[in-house]
């Protein structure tokens, strides 16, 4: 298992709130919590940037982190990530912040310590552009946006 440096910026983490951990041996994501001082009412259509109380330094250029929504918040309450997916580069060392957006019709209260997103560590391949005049023909060609059908 890879090791990633993490700084605890909020003393409640590891005390009142558990450290992020994988729930099962098959879990891909680590839950991130809202390190708030008081409950936050998120009105319909409102976005807020929430602190997680953690800073990470992945360091390995072959890795990055993705911050993804928790399925229950979006499906049951309409609360999703404001930027849909967050990308944490390997050389970033600041606090992890989570943008949340209430796309639902009702106000939603986020409690201090509530799990608001999940972080997944993913491999990264950097590519270099090779400028060409034409591509080698493929079966698909330039077909996109529904080109392959629905069924």
Curated annotation (Swiss-Prot):
Binding residues annotated for substrate, in chain numbering: 70-72, 83, 87-89, 97
Pathway: Pyrimidine metabolism; dUMP biosynthesis; dUMP from dCTP (dUTP route): step 2/2
Entry EC number(s): 3.6.1.23
Keywords: Hydrolase, Magnesium, Metal-binding, Nucleotide metabolism
Any one GO biological process: dUMP biosynthetic process
CDD domains per the UniProt record, alphabetical: trimeric_dUTPase
Cofactor section: Mg(2+)
Gene Ontology terms, MF aspect: dUTP diphosphatase activity; magnesium ion binding
Enzyme class, UniProt record, top EC level: hydrolase
Catalytic activities: dUTP + H2O = dUMP + diphosphate + H(+)
Matching InterPro entries: dUTPase, dUTPase-like, dUTPase-like_sf, dUTPase_trimeric
Cited SUPFAM superfamilies: dUTPase-like
Family matches, as NCBIfam families: dut, PRK00601.1
Function: This enzyme is involved in nucleotide metabolism: it produces dUMP, the immediate precursor of thymidine nucleotides and it decreases the intracellular concentration of dUTP so that uracil cannot be incorporated into DNA.
Protein family (similarity comment): Belongs to the dUTPase family.
The protein's name: Deoxyuridine 5'-triphosphate nucleotidohydrolase
Organism: Proteus mirabilis (strain HI4320)
Lineage start: Bacteria, Pseudomonadati, Pseudomonadota, Gammaproteobacteria, Enterobacterales
């Amino acid at each position: 298992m890879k090791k990633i440096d993490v700084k605890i910026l909020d003393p409640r983490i590891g005390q009142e709130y558990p450290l992020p951990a994988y729930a099962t041996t098959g879990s891909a994501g680590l839950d991130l919590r809202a390190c708030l001082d008081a409950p936050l009412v998120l009105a319909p259509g409102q976005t807020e940037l929430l602190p997680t109380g953690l800073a990470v330094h992945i360091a390995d250029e072959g890795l990055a982190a993705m911050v993804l929504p928790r399925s229950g918040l979006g499906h049951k309450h309409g609360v999703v990530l404001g930027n849909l997916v967050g990308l944490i580069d390997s050389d970033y060392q600041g606090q992890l912040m989570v943008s949340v957006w209430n796309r639902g019709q009702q106000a939603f209260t986020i409690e201090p310590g509530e799990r608001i997103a999940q972080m997944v560590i993913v491999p990264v391949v950097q590519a270099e552009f090779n400028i060409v005049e034409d591509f080698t023909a493929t079966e698909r060609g330039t077909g996109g946006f529904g080109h392959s059908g629905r069924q």
